[in-house]
């Protein structure tokens, strides 16, 4: 990555991008609670909290990125097709997002 590309990335409005992504994901990604893990907390001597993203419709957090990207594409971009290289959670997220679009 060239220095100009790094500077451009640093100047982006990440807060606005996050708000837009959250808007796109409304009604898609499930809200998962943060839950304590007494067993892991006892084992480590520290409070351990878990976010069970395995409860998402695709079984992982990957639905968030895949859905957000596909939802951001124009009709022209969609017409060219969607390709992913994954045999796992990302592929499931892409397939789900493409079907829902």
Task: Give, region by region, the residue ranges found by the protein language model.
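PLP-dependent amino-acid enzyme catalytic core
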Residues: 1-101
């Amino acid at each position: 990555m060239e220095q100009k590309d790094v500077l451009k990335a640093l100047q982006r409005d990440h807060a606005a991008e996050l708000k837009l992504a959250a808007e796109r994901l409304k009604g898609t990604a499930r809200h998962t609670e943060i839950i304590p893990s007494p067993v892991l907390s006892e084992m480590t001597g520290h409070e351990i909290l878990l976010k069970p993203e395995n409860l998402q419709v695709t079984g992982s957090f990957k639905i968030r990125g895949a859905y957000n990207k596909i939802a951001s594409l124009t009709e022209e971009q969609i017409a060219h097709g969607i390709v992913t290289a994954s045999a796992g959670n990302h592929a499931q997220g892409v397939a789900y997002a493409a079907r829902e679009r």
